[in-house]
Amino acid sequence: MVEETTLDLVKQLIEGSPERKFSESLDIAINLKNLDMSQPKNRVDEEIILPNGLGKTMKIAVFAKGEVGLNAKDAGCDYILTEEDIKELGEDKSKARSLANECDFFIAEVQYMAQIGKALGAILGPRGKMPVPLTPDKNVADLINSTKNSVRIRSKDKLTFHVSVGRRDMDVEKLAENIETVLGRLEHSLEKGKHNLKSVYVTTTMGNSVRLV
């Protein structure tokens, strides 16, 4: 059950924003306080599974081979990348950047992580897209399905950052639930919890914004 305040504010935002010819993204803008962001321990870097997804198709690439690669393909991932592909992408930075921009998430069998870090870390790292490790105890299909409903919140060294929580045309209660999930996880990751939150705004891509915190 979502908070009435969150639900009311999302309704207010959507009703007060003009209709667009495309499906707008609904984002939250987060402003932190009383944190020294030059200290890595204070930076936010969390991957969060949204209970209601983002309302759009996520592109996922998987570094795998053999049966794992086949299972990933059956699960609907967009690209299966091999050891040879890692080497090729490492040598062709333009192609690597294009793939990094196209895909929302990457998954990799653990034996490829070191090679990926060396060949592609400089491209994937700053984008917050280093692969999610696929350990032997995990099922690749389950990981793909959960990743499709995930967002990553990253502050880097800034006190202000944004994260998408869905699309404007989603059910209002589902959007509110997504927002509360992100904020709950964010507060848990901060040293002083909600006391490190200066403000939180909910906004559409081209519309108005409303203050939640």
Curated annotation (Swiss-Prot):
GO terms for biological process: regulation of translation; translation. GO terms for cellular component: large ribosomal subunit. PROSITE patterns: RIBOSOMAL_L1. InterPro entries: Ribosomal_uL1, Ribosomal_uL1-like, Ribosomal_uL1/biogenesis, Ribosomal_uL1_3-a/b-sand, Ribosomal_uL1_arc, Ribosomal_uL1_CS. GO terms for molecular function: rRNA binding; structural constituent of ribosome; tRNA binding. Keywords: Repressor, Ribonucleoprotein, Ribosomal protein, RNA-binding, rRNA-binding, Translation regulation, tRNA-binding. It holds the Pfam family Ribosomal_L1. Binds directly to 23S rRNA. Probably involved in E site tRNA release. Part of the 50S ribosomal subunit. Belongs to the universal ribosomal protein uL1 family. This is Large ribosomal subunit protein uL1. It comes from Methanococcoides burtonii (strain DSM 6242 / NBRC 107633 / OCM 468 / ACE-M).
